[in-house]
UniProtKB/Swiss-Prot annotation:
It comes from the Viruses. The keyword Metal-binding does not apply. This is Ankyrin repeat protein OPG189. ANK repeats lie at residues 65-95, 169-205, 209-239, 243-272, 276-304, 339-368, 372-401. The keyword Metal-binding does not apply. The gene is OPG189. Contributes to viral release without involving rearrangement of host actin. It comes from Vaccinia virus (strain Western Reserve). InterPro entries: Ankyrin_rpt (IPR002110), Ankyrin_rpt-contain_sf (IPR036770), PRANC_domain (IPR018272). Gene3D superfamilies: Ankyrin repeat-containing domain. Keywords: ANK repeat, Late protein, Repeat.
């Protein structure tokens, strides 16, 4: 609830500022603006308001001291007067007036001279000076950097300001400079970072997340070689952050070839592992061959975890790097995990299309079955990936793997029906369905039969009496008709099929009824000269071609 209150207050302030700005632009307010100076002290300001104002570094620059706002400064007179008007008139926050008198500032002020006066003014209430002399923590420019910060820093460093003062997140000004680095303003940021480095700012000081300025320089999109070399002179090249990433991890991830080369030449640990077990080499290999060559040519022997590194390449679909490392004999793609997962199975799992095609073209075995009963095909269905499914089916998987795939697919309540139909359509064209159904083979398909009636129903086309496995799986409209195709006598006694519930009980009852009809009709026909000569199997075969109604009718006639 507190979060929502805070957000509502933020938006209220924000909208109020815009409303005031519109009012100021539509009406003549020169008499109001003249009433306010750019320098003001406000007592006991709500911290939420201070936090909000501090998020607008491009509009306002705020100095704090305890519960008071010491100073509000902006390059734009109108913006400054708007916020002062807002604090005075809208929020009714009391002020004690300016603590530096008679500056008479205008929009064309000399910033350097102005800041110098702020720091050195002899007024007894000069709280900025008191704050610096007492070594108080402040976030006035440590947390929120504006265009004029370089001038602030130069003056304050010359007056003994502690250059590595921390904010509430443990960040120094050097941290913040790198956090907020903008390419569009790189010249200003580069100048400030050099000032801080040349004045001894600690490049190994960690914030609350374990980031040092040097780690941040490696992590962020800053490609200034001069700054990197200055930092490198005093930095711990193997320092780690909260996730145990080193500078070499980050420059490898960012594909900063020159920085990687410098760190390796300085002896950075190429086998350092982060908390996820990844080394800098793993981070670099996804970007291409140049970084791979750089690592392989280093004097230190690389620690290679084959399964880990191949899977890493698969996740990023880095085919070029995979091919190069295979050609150098660094990795082997023919691994199997304890779950019987292969590199091809991993490529399907991570939707790495290019890698999958590459591995299949190398005659990789994709007919693997994991310990949980999954296959590459069932995994493609689970990922709803039609393109990968088409690639796998184009490689002509066997009947065994297709049946196992469909069983695995239908074990899940939710699956892509269209992809399952692709499997059925492919399997229906195969010629391996010559065996008549019996109890044992029925057990093999029970999960499939039970869970995909809709898909089966679409494939039904014929009602041949002696059903094969193909006809049972793909041509039956309803499970109740199973009783017409149970060729094995013990099917009637198969109690394990009770998983089907009432349907199976009805099937068994129907089969018993049909068996009784056939038996009775056969006995009725036995007195005939020719019928009694037939073996019982032939009698049964002939009578089985009649449906239940026909059998009942013949019995009545006889």
């Amino acid at each position: 609830m507190d979060f929502f209150k805070k957000e509502i207050l933020d938006w209220s302030i924000y909208l109020s500022l815009h409303y005031i700005a519109r009012v100021f632009s539509n009406f003549s307010t020169s008499h109001i603006i003249q009433d306010y100076n750019l320098v003001r002290t406000y007592e006991k300001v709500d911290k939420t308001i201070v936090d909000f104002l501090s998020r607008l570094p491009n509009l306002f620059h705020i100095l704090e001291y305890g519960e008071n706002i010491l100073h509000i400064y902006s390059m734009d007179d109108a913006n400054t007067n708007i916020i002062i008007f807002f604090l005075d008139r809208v929020l009714n926050i009391n002020k004690n007036g300016s603590f530096i008198h008679n500056l008479r500032l205008s929009s064309s002020i000399n910033i350097k001279e102005y800041v110098y006066q702020l720091v050195n003014n002899d007024h007894p209430d000069n709280r900025i000076r008191l704050m610096l002399e007492n070594g108080r923590r402040t976030r006035h420019f440590l947390s929120y950097i504006s265009d004029t910060v370089n001038i602030y820093i130069c003056i304050l460093i010359n007056h003994g300001f502690y250059i590595d003062a921390e904010d509430s997140y443990g960040c120094t000004l050097l941290h913040r400079c790198i956090y907020h680095y903008k390419k569009s303003e790189s010249e200003s940021y580069n100048e400030l970072i050099k000032i801080l480095l040349n004045n001894g700012s600690d490049v190994d000081k960690k914030d609350t997340y374990g980031n040092t300025p040097f780690i941040l320089l490696c992590k962020h999109d800053i490609n200034n070689v001069e700054l990197f070399e200055i930092c490198l002179e005093n930095a711990n090249i193997d320092s780690v952050d909260f996730n145990r990433y080193t500078p070499l991890h980050y420059v490898s991830c960012r594909n900063k070839y020159d920085f990687v080369k410098l760190l390796i030449s300085k002896g950075a640990n190429v086998n350092a592992r982060n908390r996820f077990g990844t080394t800098p080499f793993y981070c670099g290999i996804i970007h291409g061959i140049s970084l791979i060559k750089l690592y392989l040519e280093s004097d230190t022997e690389l620690e290679i975890d084959n399964e880990h590194i191949v899977r890493h390449l698969i996740i990023f679909d880095a085919v070029e790097s995979l091919d190069y490392l295979l050609s150098r004999g660094v990795i082997d793609i023919n691994y199997r995990t304890i779950y019987n997962e292969t590199s091809i199975y991993d490529a399907v799992s991570y939707n790495a299309y290019n890698t999958l095609v590459y591995l299949l073209n190398r005659n990789g075995d994709f007919e693997t079955i994991t310990t949980s009963g999954c296959t590459c095909i069932s995994e493609a269905v689970a990922n709803n990936n039609k393109i990968i499914m088409e690639v796998l089916l184009s490689k002509r998987p066997s009947l065994k793997i297709m049946i196992q795939s469909m069983i695995a697919i239908t074990k899940h309540k939710q699956h892509n029906a269209d992809l399952l139909k692709m499997c059925i359509k492919y399997t229906a064209c195969m010629t391996d369905y010559d065996t008549l159904i019996d109890v044992q083979s029925l057990q093999q398909y029970k999960w499939y039969i039970l869970k995909c009636f809709d898909e089966i129903d679409i494939m039904k086309r014929c009602y041949i009496k002696n059903k094969t496995v193909f006809q049972l799986v793909f041509c039956i409209k309803d499970i109740n008709t199973l009783m017409r195709y149970g060729k094995h006598p013990s099917f009637v006694k198969c109690t394990s099929l009770d998983v089907y519930g009432s349907r199976v009980r009805n099937i068994i009852a129907s089969i018993r009824y049909r068996q009784r009809l056939i038996s009775l009709l056969s006995k009725k026909l036995d007195p005939g000269d020719k019928w009694s000569c037939f073996p019982n199997e032939i009698k049964y075969k002939i009578l089985e071609n009649f449906n239940d109604n026909e059998l009942s009718t013949y019995l009545k006639i006889l």
